[in-house]
From Swiss-Prot:
Stretch forming the signal peptide: 1-23
Lineage: superkingdom: Eukaryota
Record-given protein name: Metabotropic glutamate receptor 6
Family named by the database record: Belongs to the G-protein coupled receptor 3 family.
Glycan attachment positions: 290, 445, 473, 561
Keyword Ribosomal protein in record: no
Known partners and oligomeric status: Homodimer. Interacts with GPR179. Interacts with photoreceptor synaptic protein LRIT1 (via its N-terminal extracellular domain).
Taxon lineage: Eukaryota, Metazoa, Chordata, Craniata, Vertebrata
Cytoplasmic side, ranges: 603-616, 668-691, 765-777, 840-871
Coiled coil: none
Organism expressing this protein natively: Mus musculus (Mouse)
Keyword tags: Cell membrane, Cell projection, Disulfide bond, Endoplasmic reticulum, G-protein coupled receptor, Glycoprotein, Golgi apparatus, Membrane, Receptor, Sensory transduction, Signal, Transducer, Transmembrane, Transmembrane helix, Vision
Stretches in topological domain Extracellular: 24-579, 638-648, 713-742, 801-813
One GO BP: G protein-coupled receptor signaling pathway
């Protein structure tokens, strides 16, 4: 620090001797206390030149605002009475290094004061003292600079000499560091507030994926850094790309910027912290890339509500949202500035250049001639009448900065020079540290009526106006900036006032991923919290929240859009169902036929045909057939405890009763035939009573088993939601049924199927019985056909176990198979007999008796007769 200070002292002394930045390069006002001023009167020069073109608004307007403020303060008898404020106003040429050279002139008086002892000992040859230049003004405080990079460079010098500095435009967050920039203050809020406001705007617009664009330097880079940091802490906003525009951009640099931005086309929102020149060239590159309307700009206060960055580029700027520290147009300055002329404003050395630029004319200087191609200035032109005029946005803050110093000096004067008019010895010279204390303590209403104050870091409170550039009647060139909101610690954005290309009131998206539709969840991309893939909540899952899918409960299915669950419809086989038509038809016809046959047999109970068929077992068999047909109605009926109990009992009872009777009858025929081969003694248990006992004994096993089942597992109805849980939830149904599984159902029929197989075996064995045993072959054909029916039933029944129509197919298959097996028995064994009884009664007579001996001569000697076995 010591070496740097010595170096700066030497450099400042050399500049003072050389006369640099003194005289023609500055605006000077005499006064008891001198304020310094730094303004970007000219743009940065190119090709090695320090300064470029004149900046009418940012430069001249702001400089004149300081002169206007000084005039008002010096004319105010209540503020600093007896003290006149002077000024030394310099041009920074928008370059930090050049501004540093200029700012060194502010410390010349301090250097001279400290070097007087040394200079007194210096003598020229002959003892003549050296010639001295006029002593420079002692600058007590500095207003400026504009760009943050310039303010940082200057602040590093001014703090060494304890000269307070107040900026009217520098907003870099870096300048809030009071340990490094302890003599720096500003009447504009730092970019940390601005960045917070921009984050709030982005979130209010529903954007979560944006890119940032910054001019190289403290302002742009610090602003973007603050935005990124705040957005990261707030969450919900991701940065697609952060692009920096070089301080000295090469040809094609801005086309490269646009190409990089298009690498993430979904990030349409562009947060731009850039100077006016860079903003303009970015818009030009956008037009040349034919991307007008694609990017959605959110500009910082360097864009604000200025026309110059978007002049002739209005189409590209339509929809841009910009931010500007809350300000108001100062009417008094407008009146002051619009009355400035070449005659009454000779103190501003750059005003003639402004005049030529503003009126597009040329002044004739002494010894020269005006350019023939340019109109000659008359000097009678009027600002605002012969040229366009709009007050520059930072004029208010320049005035407030000057007044802040004046109020601080006034408070300091009252404290150090009580009752004294003019400066007192306590303020000569003015101590910079003491003045800084009073600056930080000021609080007054500024030129726009808003409070001016500083916090402990020298920052002003954050208050911003939010604008949007909007087309007028569809024309961008005739559009303008419209106020759409404010920010003061919280955002107030009028969404209805916003206008966009396309649908004027629909905010264009700037999102990494489009919002997921109903019934879809976000599957986040690792490492990019704002990007996701949409994954459908398919099957029986529904969307719980934007990140989660869950399965619906077993008794429910998802809504069509999978945003919730709804009860699964319950179905059953109804009487009106097409699936029930055929089983019911067969059952009705079967019951009618069975009833007719039973009635016929009972009416002709003592006729030879009825007697020969074995009346007792025939009635048992017909009863079983009747029950088989009747079970169809129980299978179609609505399931309940009583129906389910009846199904268990009757499902196997009818078939067991039928096949027990057929087995008993077939076994009797087989035993009689086999016994006849060996002897004439009849086999045991062939009487009708024995046959009934055997039949009911076989049937009782089924009854006992079912009763035990009913006791162990009481019947009840259930709703099975798995049976018709199809791939498509819309087709899912809950099935109301009895609590009988497929295996339970087969188990219920298993015993009767065993009897059927056994009966078939005996029928095969008895196939060689003589024709006198006339029922052997019909029974055989009955059993063969029945076996075929049940063999077909098994694959159909179990092959449809996974079908959505399972309840219908299986019930229909079972009932039809039962009815067909019953119909085969009825048709093979009793229809022919009934036909003879009803239509050929002449054949229902007892034929000649054949003795058992006669009948069995083919196998063994006769021993007895049995009229029941012959027709």
């Amino acid at each position: 620090m010591g070496r740097l200070r010595v170096l700066l002292l030497w450099l400042a002394w050399w500049l003072s001797q050389a006369g640099i930045a003194h005289g023609a390069g500055s605006v000077r006002l005499a006064g008891g206390l001198t304020l310094g001023g730094l303004f970007p009167v000219h743009a940065r020069g190119a090709a090695g030149r320090a300064c470029g073109t004149l900046k009418k608004e940012q430069g001249v307007h702001r400089l004149e605002a300081m002169l206007y403020a000084l005039d008002r303060i010096n004319a105010d008898p209540e503020l600093l009475p007896g003290v006149r404020l002077g000024a030394r106003l310099l041009d920074t040429c928008s370059r930090d290094t050049y501004a540093l050279e200029q700012a060194l002139s502010f410390v010349q008086a301090l250097i001279r004061g400290r070097g007087d002892g040394e200079e007194a000992s210096v003598r020229c040859p002959g003892g003549v003292p050296p010639l001295r230049a006029a002593p420079p003004e002692r600058v007590v405080a500095v207003v400026g600079a504009s760009a943050s990079s310039v303010s940082i460079m200057v602040a590093n010098v001014l703090r060494l000499f304890a000269i307070p500095q107040i900026s009217y435009a520098s907003t870099a967050p870096e300048l809030s560091d009071s340990t490094r920039y302890d003599f720096f203050s500003r009447v504009v809020p730092p970019d940390s507030y601005q960045a917070q406001a921009m984050v709030d705007i982005v979130r209010a617009l529903g954007w979560n994926y944006v890119s940032t664009l910054a001019s190289e330097g403290n302002y742009g880079e610090s602003g973007v850094e603050a935005f990124v940091q705040i957005s990261r802490e707030a969450g919900g906003v991701c940065i697609a790309q952060s692009i920096k525009i070089p301080r000295e951009p090469k040809p094609g640099e801005f086309h490269k910027v646009i190409r990089r931005l298009m690498e993430t086309p979904n990030a349409r929102g562009i947060i731009i912290f850039a100077n006016e020149d860079d903003i303009r060239r970015v818009l030009e590159a956008t037009r040349q890339a034919n991307l007008t309307g694609h990017f959605l700009w959110v500009g910082s206060d360097s864009w604000g509500s200025k026309i110059s960055p978007i002049l002739n580029l209005e189409e590209e700027a339509v929809g841009a949202i910009t931010i500007l520290p809350k300000r108001a147009s100062i009417d008094g300055f407008d009146q002051y500035f619009m009355t400035r002329s070449l005659e009454n404003n000779r103190r501003n050395i750059w005003f003639a250049e402004f005049w030529e630029e503003n009126f597009n004319c040329k002044l004739t200087s002494s010894g020269g001639q005006s350019d023939d191609s340019t109109r000659k200035c008359t000097g009678e032109e009027r600002i605002g009448q012969d040229s366009t005029y709009e007050q520059e946005g930072k004029v208010q803050f320049v005035i407030d900065a000057v007044y802040a110093i004046a109020h601080a000096l006034h408070s300091m004067h009252q404290a150090l020079c009580p009752g004294h008019t003019g400066l007192c010895p306590a303020m000569e010279p003015t101590d910079g540290r003491t003045l800084l204390h009073y600056i930080r303590a000021v609080r007054f209403n500024g030129s726009a009526g808003t409070p001016v104050m500083f916090n402990e870091n020298g920052d002003a409170p954050g208050r911003y106006d939010i604008f949007q550039y909007q087309a007028t009647n569809g024309s961008a060139s005739s559009g303008g900036y419209q106020a759409v909101g404010q920010w003061a610690e919280a955002l107030r954005l009028d969404m209805e006032a916003l206008q966009w290309s396309g649908d004027p009131h629909e905010v264009p998206p700037s999102q990494c991923s489009l919002p997921c539709g109903p019934g879809e969840r976000k599957k986040m991309v690792k490492g990019v919290p704002c990007c996701w893939h949409c994954e459908a909540c398919d099957g029986y899952r529904f969307q719980v929240d934007e990140f989660t899918c869950e399965a619906c409960p077993g008794h429910m299915r998802p809504t069509p859009n999978h945003t919730g669950c709804r009860p699964t419809p319950v179905v059953r086989l109804t009487w009106s169902s097409p699936w029930a038509a055929l089983p019911l038809l067969l059952a009705v016809l079967g019951i009618m036929a069975t009833t007719t046959i039973i009635a016929t047999f009972m009416r002709h109970n003592d006729t030879p045909i009825v007697r020969a068929s074995g009346r007792e077992l025939s009635y048992v068999l017909l009863t079983g057939i009747f029950l088989i047909y009747a079970i169809t109605f129980l299978m179609v009926a609505e399931p309940c405890a009583a129906v389910c109990a009846s199904r268990r009992l009757l499902l196997g009872l009818g078939t067991t009763l039928s096949y027990s009777a057929l087995l008993t009858k077939t076994n009797r025929i087989y035993r009689i035939f086999e016994q006849g081969k060996r002897s004439v003694t009849p086999p045991p248990f062939i009487s009708p009573t024995s046959q009934l006992v055997i039949t009911f004994g076989l049937t009782s096993l089924q009854v006992v088993g079912v009763i035990a089942w009913l006791g162990a597992q009481p019947p009840h109805s259930v709703i099975d939601y798995e049976e018709q849980r199809t791939v498509d939830p819309e087709q899912a149904r809950g099935v109301l049924k009895c609590d009988m599984s497929d295996l339970s159902l087969i188990g219920c029929l298993g015993y009767s199927l065993l009897l059927m197989v056994t009966c078939t075996v005996y029928a095969i064995k008895a196939r060689g019985v003589p024709e006198t045993f006339n029922e052997a072959k019909p029974i055989g054909f009955t059993m063969y056909t029945t076996c075929i029916i049940w063999l077909a039933f098994v694959p159909i029944f179990f092959g449809t176990a996974q079908s959505a129509e399972k309840i219908y197919i299986q019930t229909t298959t079972l009932t039809v198979s039962l009815s067909l097996s019953a119909s085969v028995s009825l048709g093979m064994l009793y229809v022919p007999k009934t036909y003879v009884i009803l239509f050929h009664p002449e054949q229902n007579v007892q034929k000649r008796k054949r003795s058992l001996k006669k009948t069995s001569t083919m196998a063994a000697p006769p021993k007895s007769e049995n009229s029941e076995d012959a027709k």
